[in-house]
């Protein structure tokens, strides 16, 4: 059916209005500020929705529009109607995205990351698995080291054992692997049984988001007590409006 002249006029007016709105949002030629904006750590500079100027990509939970685009490298898309009261748009994860969110940052499927220098994690199927990088063994007092203690070493991630003498005077580092005869427990000979002894895993260190749980166990090649740690997730932290979610597990 052919439209009437009145219908044609209405359609033409609508096109003119849309063109005017886009012209206001996307000026021609491009007029961009110099120097470009400085983005927070981990936030990339991207072209705006007009393909004109470089802007800081919007992060998870932040408002977005045609000009202020979401960080596509983190699997974020601009979802209309996701703002307060169903108004506006927010940067959210795509429904089919299998990335992981840790401490307010997103990681892709298969990507490895370290939320702390003592832990290495891998993103898998929307979750993550982690392994500790520091030994958590327990040094028992011995004849040649009656007061072993673990200390933080400047410039190193993992604490180290030292043998304190005289209230901290004359401390000497203990070797990473004990010698054949030094008072330290060596690994068990083959065939010697080691009765398993472990405490229950303690509560998660955080009420929401990524945390740490600990226990004491002798399940190691030395058959001696050590403090073991593993990551825990009590429940996801609720996203904060206008800001990237934060986590204080580390």
UniProtKB/Swiss-Prot annotation:
Biological classification of the source: Eukaryota, Metazoa, Chordata, Craniata, Vertebrata
Origin: domain of life: Eukaryota
PROSITE patterns, A to Z: IGFBP_N_1 (PS00222), IGFBP_N_2 (PS51323), TSP1 (PS50092), VWFC_1 (PS01208), VWFC_2 (PS50184)
Protein name in the entry: CCN family member 5
Gene: CCN5
InterPro entries: CCN (IPR050941), Growth_fac_rcpt_cys_sf (IPR009030), IGFBP-like (IPR000867), Insulin_GF-bd_Cys-rich_CS (IPR017891), TSP1_CCN (IPR043973), TSP1_rpt (IPR000884), TSP1_rpt_sf (IPR036383), VWF_dom (IPR001007)
Major site of localization recorded for this protein: secreted
Organism: Homo sapiens
GO terms under cellular component: extracellular matrix; extracellular space; nucleus
Any one Gene Ontology molecular-function term assigned to this protein's record: heparin binding
Record PANTHER family: CCN FAMILY MEMBER 5 (PTHR11348:SF22), CONNECTIVE TISSUE GROWTH FACTOR-RELATED (PTHR11348)
UniProt-listed Gene3D superfamilies: Thrombospondin type-1 (TSP1) repeat
Family under the similarity heading: Belongs to the CCN family.
């Amino acid at each position: 059916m052919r439209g009437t002249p009145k219908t044609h006029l209405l359609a033409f007016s609508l096109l003119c209005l849309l063109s005017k709105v886009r012209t206001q949002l996307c000026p021609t030629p491009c007029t961009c500020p110099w120097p470009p904006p400085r983005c927070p750590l981990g936030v990339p500079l991207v072209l705006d929705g007009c393909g004109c100027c470089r802007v800081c990509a919007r992060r998870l939970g932040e408002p977005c529009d045609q000009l202020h685009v979401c960080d596509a490298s983190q699997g974020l898309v601009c979802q209309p109607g996701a703002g307060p009261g169903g108004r506006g748009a927010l940067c959210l994860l795509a429904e089919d995205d299998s990335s992981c969110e840790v401490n307010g940052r997103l990681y892709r499927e298969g990507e490895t990351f370290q939320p702390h220098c003592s832990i290495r994690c891998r993103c898998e199927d929307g979750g993550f698995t982690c392994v500790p990088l520091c030994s958590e063994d327990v040094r028992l007092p011995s004849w040649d080291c009656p007061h072993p203690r673990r200390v933080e070493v400047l410039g190193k991630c993992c604490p180290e054992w030292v043998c304190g003498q005289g209230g901290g005077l004359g401390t000497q580092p203990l070797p990473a692997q004990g010698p054949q005869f030094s008072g330290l427990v060596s690994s068990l000979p083959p065939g010697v049984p080691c009765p398993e002894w472990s405490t229950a895993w303690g509560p998660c260190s955080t009420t929401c988001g990524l945390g740490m749980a600990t226990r004491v166990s002798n399940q190691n090649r030395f058959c001696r007590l050590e403090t073991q740690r593993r990551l825990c997730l009590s429940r996801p932290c609720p996203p904060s409006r206008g800001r990237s979610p934060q986590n204080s597990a580390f």
